[in-house]
Each structure stands twice: as C-alpha cells, then as structure tokens.
Amino acid sequence: CVHPQFRSGKALSMLWLNLVPKVLWSMRAKYVMGCVSIHLEDNLARAYYTHRQIQQLADHQIIDIRSNRAFEPERPEYSFPQDERMPKLFDTYLGMQSKLSKQAFYDEDFKCLDYFVFLEINKIATSFVMNKMVQR
C-alpha cells in the first residue's frame, strides 16, 4: 500500500524505475503480483464504471483469478462524466501490460474493491521502465 499523499503518477514512476532494475532484476524475479483498488465510499459511480470497463478488457489483459468474496457494484442512480473514466492507476498498470482479474474482492476494512494484478517483469521493463528512462 502507498500512503494517499504519495499516490501519484510521479511516485509510481519512481517506484517502478527503482524497483525493477535494482530489486527485481537482482532477484531474478519473473513476475510481480498484487492488487489495485478503488474506494467505494462516496465513489460508487466510479467503482461501477471501472468494474464495467474491466469486464470489457481483451483476453490478453485478463487473468482468471476468482474471489470468494466477489462484489458486483450496482448501477448508480446518477453519475458525472468523470465517474465514467477508469482511474489513472488502473490505466497505468494496463499500460505496463499487466493483467487484471475481472472479479473484485470486497475489502471491508478499507471499504474498497481490490482487483488482482499480475505483471511479467520483462514486460514491465520493455513497456514502462525503458520508456521512462528514455524520457529522462
């Protein structure tokens, strides 16, 4: 988990630019897995539309990991255009060629939906790290 104050594209870039070459390659890691979350509290419309978009992802963007506490967000009574956009962190992970689970795990403690994320180190290196290093 990353503290909300540091959840930005710049912070994520710094994490991956340092984590991949310095830690993961030295460990000879092949894969990284974790989760990406969307808060439900005062955010039901965004959670609903994000969940819908994840259901529409291509097969190469999906990993079949099922949750025993799956959660299906209900369609909101109203929403704003910004609610219909997938959160940037989800887009970033998809841009890194990661795979997401279609099912969301409902985390009662944090009041959020967690989607499983699976990344191949070689894909991170080619699609994200090298691209960011060239941009420096």
Where do the language-model regions lie?
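Acyl-donor binding region in acyl/amide transferases
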Residues: 1-98, 108-112
